[in-house]
Each structure stands twice: as C-alpha cells, then as structure tokens.
Amino acid sequence: MPMITPDEIDFEKYERETDAKRKVKPASQWVQELIDRIKNPTYQPRSVMPWRKTHKLIQFRPGEVTVWGGANGNGKSLVTGQVALSMCGQDEKVCIASFEMKPSKTLERMARQWSTYNVSDPAFQGDERATAQFLDLYEQFRDWTDNKLWLYDQQGTVTASQVCAVVRYCAKEKGITQFFVDSLMKCVA
C-alpha cells in the first residue's frame, strides 16, 4: 500500500501557497453558477456513510469540511475508519492522517472492519486454516485498498500549516478526495 512519508515531499512548496492569493475572489464570480444550476439542475454524486438509514440525512459533498467530535476514547477513530472504508467503496480516494496511531495500527483496525474478522480473537489462535484464511483476507484487503486508501505516516504534534500542505499535496498530486485528520488536538501553532 502506498505510504506518504514527510521526508520524501517538499511540503514547504505547498505551505508557501497563500490562501489570500488563491481564495479571495469577487462574489460575482459565482452568480453564473447559481443561474446555471436553476436552468440546468444536475445530480451531483455524494458520498454517504455506510449505514443506510443515514443516507438521506448526511452526505459528503466535494469541497466541504466535516468535523467529528466527541470525548477521548469514545470511538471517533473507529467510526471514521468505517466511514473511510465506505468512501473507498464509493470510488473516493481517501487519506488518513492519524497523529495518535501508527499507520499499521490504523490499517489493522480497518482490516478487521473490512473483513469482519479479528485475527487476534483467541478462538482463531493456533488454527492453521484460520491463519491461512486471514492471510488471504489481508492480501485481498491490500489489493482492494490500492489506489483508494493512503496513510500519512506522522505521529505526535504537527503544525496546522503542515497539515494544510499535506492536504493540498494529496489533492493535487494523488487525487485524494477525502482527507481525515485524527486528531485536531495534535495540530499546534
């Protein structure tokens, strides 16, 4: 699976791009888009969460930000991992920046969610047939995630400008459409 490591990329290039230069534009620039939407309504595909009862309530549109909040240890990483897998299944390209867990730990959890099996379950320990099935499942998972799922390999604190640079890099260079930051508390000034 492709990894994004901080040492391989000139993130300073992306940090030098100022928001003011790229983002401040006259409001009139968007009026024609509003007119076109009224004249020619189109369906915009949107990603949904993996739970059917949420499909009409919550959708993820391109260019928008979603913040997942909750107390420490309440399962935000677990839920967002499941949502990330669902988005991969909807042909989104996803990158996860987990500053609290190593990529292998994040991926181990996601592999359990994807396969619905826990390789650490004592019921499977010592069973050669189960081990062979797990190895096969992990190989399938590896192949399934290829060109769908990336992990940013950075633990500990990181600056907000570095996170923005990584997001821009992922969008421009990798075509990433969904970026998960876990956790914002690790982003410092």
Where are the model-predicted features located?
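Helical hairpin unit composed of two closely spaced alpha helices linked by a short loop
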Residues: 177-189
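Accessory, often N-terminal, substrate/partner-engagement and coupling regions
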Residues: 1-17
